[in-house]
Amino acid sequence: MPDRAQVIIRIVPGGGTKTLQQIINQLEYLSRKGRLELQRSARHLDIPLPPDQIHELARSWVQETGTYDESQPDEERQQELTTHIIVSFPAGTSQVAAYAASREWAAEMFGSGAGGGRYNYLTAFHIDRDHPHLHVVVNRRELLGHGWLKISRRHPQLNYDALRIKMAEISLRHGIALDASRRAERGITERPITYAQYRRLEREQARQIRFEDADLEQSSPQGDHPEFSQPFDTSPFEASAGGPEDMPRPNNRQNESQVHLQEPAGVSNEAGVLVRVALETERLAQPFVSETILADDIGSGSSRVAEGRVESANRTPDIPRAATEAATHTTHDRQRRAKRPHDDDGGPSGAKRVTLEGIAVGPQANAGEQDGSSGPLVRQAGTSRPSPPTATTRASTATDSLSATAHLQQRRGVLSKRPREDDDGEPSERKRERDERSKDGRGGNRR
């Protein structure tokens, strides 16, 4: 003979209400906002309570206490006005039998006086879980006396053992066999888990199930995702096997701006100086020129070494010379557009002209090096500092420091604060005296 299921009667801890609004909220929750039926006690002929009468019933309950003062702040109220009890049945129990047995038990314990008094109560039968259960909300104020409902182990009528035994007797009459034995009688000595611990475990299990479902969705086949369903087109790039030629190359002119040239194997990166090479097609296709960074070693020894490094980089099979020349022309065009046209009278200042002249003589110095000439211009460029990596054309050319210095000294006279007369103006007094001495023969060499 299988073991019988135990009677489960639970008094919800903290389920009592202390204010009028709390009673209304509790009844609306049990009725699921009017979707479920609330049934009154046997004293009221077990009639259902309409949802629009919940407020009226709640106010009548607080008035039955005789001590409820509506002017008192809710946070100062300490007296619990109701008690919330749940009667549960095993899963698979007939809903009709469970409802009838639980309603009869509530009338026997709180409406007949067998429990030591008569009380008003409301019930709500829920079947949203596997096990059917009945919610009982009891007005703790006794109808025929001045006492309050109290359920405890030491109460002569309303103790936990009496509640379970009465429930087992009534359930048996409705065809539900339940056992009302104690835990010690069943050989269970450890302390049971609390309701809070049970609900915590229940939430953790539900969370774990959700996480497992999310993992299954992430590990679903790629065909279910719209991004994976699109085919990958490898036609714009052609790969050849062997050596540094494995780099993807564009097969049409439209995709040249999307190719990022990598650093060739023959180019070292000791000094960390960057040479920027821009593709001409990128300048024509996009408003912003996309530049590819090539690491090169341009030391501070001489400009000839720097030129040799750049030429060795241009000779690599990964970077065609046509792309380098196109980048050089693009850079010179960009510099010419950046220069602002000036007339003869209102030219730029001395410092700006020195900078512009230094850039302009760069190609001439580079051309001199290619011809094999070794003049003072080349020697001075060899001792100059390496150009910054952000400049595109200064990495492969040397600046003419001597001509820039000479030009600066020539311009110092113009920028000097001492006023000078124009060519067509009158001569100064000192000049006139010098001219007169030279005419009289007095302006000879002085010893």
Curated annotation (Swiss-Prot):
E.C. numbers = 3.1.-.-
What class does this enzyme belong to in the EC scheme? Answer: hydrolase
Record field: compositional bias (Basic and acidic residues): 427-447
- Top-rank taxon of the source lineage equals Bacteria
Q: Which UniProt keywords apply?
A: Crown gall tumor, Endonuclease, Hydrolase, Nuclease, Plasmid
Q: Name one Pfam family in it.
A: Relaxase
Q: Which InterPro entries match?
A: Endonuclease_MobA/VirD2 (IPR005094), VirD2 (IPR016644)
Q: Where is the composition biased (Low complexity)?
A: 390-406
Q: What does this chain do?
A: Tumor formation by A.tumefaciens involves the transfer and integration of a defined segment (T-DNA) of Ti plasmid DNA into the plant nuclear genome. The virD operon encodes a site-specific endonuclease that cleaves at a unique site within both 24 bp direct repeats flanking the T-DNA.
Question: Which terms does the UniProt entry file under GO BP?
Answer: import into nucleus; symbiont-mediated induction of tumor or growth in host
Ranked from the top, the taxonomy reads: Bacteria, Pseudomonadati, Pseudomonadota, Alphaproteobacteria, Hyphomicrobiales
Question: Locations of Polar residues compositional bias?
Answer: 251-260
Its recorded name reads T-DNA border endonuclease VirD2
Q: Does the keyword Nuclease apply?
A: yes
> Does this UniProt record's set of keywords contain ATP-binding?
no
Molecular function terms, GO-annotated: DNA binding; DNA endonuclease activity
Give the residue ranges for region: Disordered.
Answer: 214-265, 300-447
Query: Organism, per UniProt?
Result: Agrobacterium fabrum (strain C58 / ATCC 33970)
